[in-house]
Each structure stands twice: as C-alpha cells, then as structure tokens.
Amino acid sequence: MESSAYPMLFSPIKVGTTEVKNRVFMPPVSTNLADHGYVTDDLVDHYRARAKGGVGLIITEVVTVEPTYTYLPGDMCCYDDTFIPGWEKLAAAVHEYGCKIMPQLFHPAYMAFNIPGTPRLIAPSFVGPFYAREAPRPITVDEIHELTHQFGDAAVRMQKAGVDGVEVHAAHAHGMLGGFLTPLYNKRTDEYGGSLDARMRFLLEVIAEIRERCGKDFIIDVRISGDEYTDGGLTLNDMIYVSRRLEKAGVDMIHVSGGTTIKRGSAIPAAGTQQASHAACSREIKKHVNIPVATVGRINEAWIAEELIEDGAADICMMGRADLCDAEFCNKAAAGNADDIRPCIGCLRCLNGIMFGKRISCTVNPDVERDEAGYEPAAEAKNVLVVGAGPAGMEAAYIAAKRGHNVVLVDKQDEPGGEMRIAAVPPAKQELTRVIKYQYRRLAEAGVKCVFGTELSAEDIQRDYAGYEVVLAYGAEPIAPAFMQGFKQVMTADDLLGGKAFPGKKIVIVGGGTVGCETADYLAPLVNDLSPANRDVTVIEMTKTLAANEGGAGRAVLITRMLSKGVHVLTEAKVTEITEDAISYEKDGEVHTIADADTLVLAMGYRPNTKLADDLAAAGVATHVLGDANKCGNIRDAIGDGYKVACEL
C-alpha cells in the first residue's frame, strides 16, 4: 500500500521474517463478541471490516490460554483444539485483504472476571490491585511450569489455525506476566522474584517455549509498559534493559505501551490528554534495540502517526480507537482523504462498557461491530423531513439519504451541531467539533438538503411537508426548577457554555454530573494559585458520586483536574432553599447557607421538549421521535438512535 499523503506510514515493514504491507497496526481492544471463548461470526465481521479497511496487522483482544480463569466473559480462548476452527475462519477472513493477524495471549491472574464458581484467584504474590475481588493465592513453581507449557500449547494451536504470530501481554502491571514483571505485585523471594532479572524469568521462559515449538517464522511480539508512571513501579531504564533482553530472547517486535491499570488514565489515555502518550518511551527504547518498536496511546490521526515514524519515535503505530471508529481509516488516509475519516474523540466509550461484560460500542460509530454494513437500500424511496441538526438528526438524515430517501434537514439554529456545540466548550472536549464537521460534511455527499435558521411549527410541517416521513430530533431543554429562579443571578450550564450568560466570581453549581463537573472545570482557574483574580467555584451534588455516568479514565482525569484547580465539592448535599442572596443546602442532617455567592449555575440534567411532537400527534401526524427529544442520553445514544430509526424508514 503506497500513499503520497503519508509515505512513511503506508510503507511496508518486516517483522521477523514476515513482511507487513504498512505500519498501521491495530492493537488489542476487547470486544466481548466471543461466545464462551469461541470465535463468532460477529467477531469475524468485525475484524474483516478492519482488514478490508487497510490495516497492516491486527492484534486481537486477549485470548486466555487455560480454562480456569476468564478475563472478560466475551473474550476468546485457545486452551484446547475445539477453538481452532473458529480461528481458521477468522485468519482466513483477515488474510483475504492482505492483512496479518495475531492473538494476544494472556492469563488474567488477579484480573479474572467474577464468574460464579471461579476458584480463588492466583497471582505472582498475595497482593493485587485495589479492585481485585479477593486477595490472590501465590502461584506455585509447578503451576508456573504448567502455565508456561499452556502458553506454548496456545501458540501452537494458533499457528495451526493460520495466524501469523502471537503477542504476549506483559504490560500495565496487568495479568499474570505483567504482574510478575512489576515490583508492584511481585513480592516473591524465590527464583521468580526479587531482582528484575528474576521477575522477567517467567516471561522469558514463555517466549522460549513459544519460539521452540513454533519456529523462527512465527512472529513473537511482547507488549510492555515503557514506564509504569507509578511510584514503586517499573521505570524507563528498567524497560530499556527488559527490551534488550527480549530482543536477545528472540522476540521480533516490542509493543511499547505505558502506565498501569491502577493509575487510571495512565495506560489508556482519555479525551483531551496528550496524543501518542507513550511515544517518549518508545523513542528511547528504539535507540537500544534492533527490532521493530511500536508505539500506542491515542494516536487518532494519520498525520500524527506519520510524524512519529518519520521522527524516529517508533517504527509502527498502533491505532486502535481510530480503526474502531472508522474501519476504513487506512484506505481513506492512504488516498489522501483524511477529512472523510470518522473522527475518534478518545472518549473511551469503547472501553467503559466492555469492562462490565457489554459488547463493544463507540460514541461516533453506531455500527462499530461491522462499520456501516448494517443498513440496506430502502425498499421504497420516501420523502423524509428531519427536524434538528444535532448528532441524532444529522445521523438520521445521512443514513436515510444513503438508503435512497429524499431528505430535508431543518434546524432553528444558524449552524449544525445542536447540543454538541455546547458540549465541545469545556476543556478536553474540543474534539467534538471534529464530529460536527464530519457529520455535516457527509450530508452534502449524501444529497441531504439542509435548511438552517428556520423553526418549524406543527402547522408549517402540515402545510409544507405533507406526505413526508417526519423525524423529530430537536433535543431537550435544561431542567430549571422554579424555586431556584429567585437568586440574583441564575443561569443554566448551557447558557453559560453557549456564551448567552456570563458568571461572576463566586459561583455555585447545582448538579455534579458530567455537565456540572465539566462546567466547574471550565470556570476554575488553570492553576490553583489562590490569586484574588481567580473564580471561586463550588459544586453541590445530591448523590455521593461525581460524574457518575462517566467511566474509568475519563472520569478520573476530569475529577482530578477539577479538584487540582481548587473547585470545592459538596456531595450528598441537597439544595433546600434559595433566596435572592443566599443558597441553603442540607448535608449530614444539618442545614448550611452560602451567603456570598454571586452566581447560581444549574446543571441538573435535561428533559425532552415534547411540544412539537405533541402538537403533531394532536393533528394526527405520525412522527419518529429520537435522540434527546425522546429520551435524554449521551452523544453515543443520540447517534445510535438516529442510525437505528433511519435504518427502519
């Protein structure tokens, strides 16, 4: 695959004895699409779409090598020969497009999923991360030898199935091999613990087992943390030494990640954080080895990947979320059509659900499993009116037009985006503007007629769009209780973020959900230096959890950043009374009053605006109501709703 736009990224590279057509590799991303460890048609379709889209090499999600412990209920396994036929089908589907494929071999150790009947967890030592469900039992030396053989057995099965190699997961203080390598969890005093050489012994024995049994033409890749970024964890100097030992042991490629699972956001970076977050580590490790080095970590644009390779930070770029968000990422980038790539915003929705056993999903791509293979041409072309150019409305309009319908999109605002324009204002949310531009750009390509600056009434629709299928996607309105309107300066978070209102210096935000916390983050000073010029921001939340609907790394980064700026937080506190000059709240059975605030910001959620739908229903006009106009949710819900309804028109 050649590209004048990104010549380095789309040049071939040799990994071991195998030539890969380009340097965009897809790293392991759990999908939960397997069935009791077996490859499913959904899994085959998922990876086939990425192979067809131009990826050079795919590393699948973790594949467990023994039957007792499961990482996630929808992950794959290879602990006996019954799994081989499914892998044969998967490998053949990927190879059809000149793409290589490797499973990531893994034992979950203290990370095992809590499935009833699972015995006590095993680990390098009796310690595990704070979220482990119990104190693990140290694995015995005999069990280490048995597990080493099981890694080899799994690799042999994969070789029989026709895959091109395996990745061994030893990163993030994660799973058995990552746990043995890190001093955070390896407290052993036998030959497998203590010094760095002893802690990597198990990993080296696994590599030797696989190489001996699978031969020199079978790729062995090891995923490591170039630095665990954690007190008491592995350092970059440690990992330079480990990398040199891995090369000497016969490893063909080193996949340099970073961080740990216990330091949220360090391994898999959240939205708004540094792109190519582990490139500094891969750059340094690359200086000390003579085998290909891959880097990873929110590399979601082709130009970033091109610069990383050209600048010597890595030989290969692992681009997971980018390829999830748009399976055609590589083909579009190679052709110089980067503007047509569905933009990954780094929000980690793809990760948050799978950790609880849910199937993979994506905020921006509603058909992430197959990538737009789910809709078919309409049996009959219809005239379709979509009211509202937010994420739900634009998705519905595009898919309906692609299916063959004649679509008109009308919005009362002067530009597209709806609530997403406001959502893009706080820190770390700016990439939502790329989604707006992408969705809007597609409308012209699909032939959608867009009318802005026009608010339609039920009478307008009956008169001007008689006979049209009517899709209502005009969003929701902020909740603003009447008793809170008496304060001297009241505004909703939407009005503040949308530039319709300007706050004072001492601000109280009612509501500590995502919007409330992001608004506080937006208002607070960048540096908490106690300057008299700084705003003083307090968030009042009636539950015990801030930003409860955010997950994992994204929530951790948001809350940590907000608190570091000096935002005051009152959880399990309920506003009870508001006068012109005071805000009273109850906490722990006592009533407190804030008497010196000058601004009250309401971030208490949203409710669907049903007036237009009600008026049309009263007039006997059938409608499809979607997005926040139907049920308030997040951007993923809105886009998914638009996709689903449009597929049914």
Task: Describe the role of every protein-language-model region.
Residues 381-410, 451-463, 473-489, 493-550, ...:
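Rossmann-like dinucleotide/flavin-binding elements
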Residues 56, 164, 252, 315, ...:
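Conserved acidic residues
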Residues 289, 312-313, 446, 486, ...:
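Short, structured coil segments at secondary-structure junctions
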Residues 409-446, 520-575:
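Rossmann-like dinucleotide-binding cores of NAD(P)H-dependent redox enzymes
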Residues 257, 296, 365, 453-455, ...:
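Conserved beta-strand termini and adjacent loop/short-helix elements that scaffold enzyme active sites
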Residues 264-271, 292, 315-316, 420-428, ...:
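Short beta-alpha connecting loops at secondary-structure transitions
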